[in-house]
């Protein structure tokens, strides 16, 4: 069992957090404006966590890390945010505000609907991610029901975000349904 703080109370954080609870993990939900009794303040949630999932609007990442960076020391931080209005989808330039954290990029390339029901036509969806290969992230992705595909260390963040841009284009520009996923096939 892993203790996890889910920062963000929207569809992505709630759906992933509930999947982790069903898998047996201890999950605390946090937001800037906690609504007791279920939601904690961000600092309180981080204090009791080994892993932190960032599931807030992407533009808020720099401020959150500036305020809570020291508290993230020694923790794995999974960045699931997307700043769709920004120049880039991620804010990795803010990661140095939490120098003791180990960052991974995951859960940002599919719609939250795939985290609630991770298969289509009997096929399990793949989730591309990057970050440290020894941080337990693959297990947490599998615990949501997805097949993890690691594309490298955190320096591969733009590769992962390329898959996100593809998903956004297919869904929002081409009109495909949000329950759209990717599958890597090999021979």
Question: Residues of each region from the PLM?
Answer:
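NAD(P)+-binding Rossmann beta1-loop-alpha1 motif at the extreme N-terminus of oxidoreductases
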Residues: 1-41
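Residues at the starts of beta-strands that form the adenosine-phosphate
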Residues: 3, 26, 50, 126, ...
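Rossmann-like NAD(P)-binding element
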Residues: 42-76, 80-83
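Short, conserved loop/helix-junction motifs that constitute active-site signature segments
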Residues: 67-74, 97-99, 121-122
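Rossmann-fold NAD(P)-binding glycine/threonine-rich loop
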Residues: 81-120
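Active-site-lining helix/loop region of Rossmann-like oxidoreductase modules
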Residues: 126-187
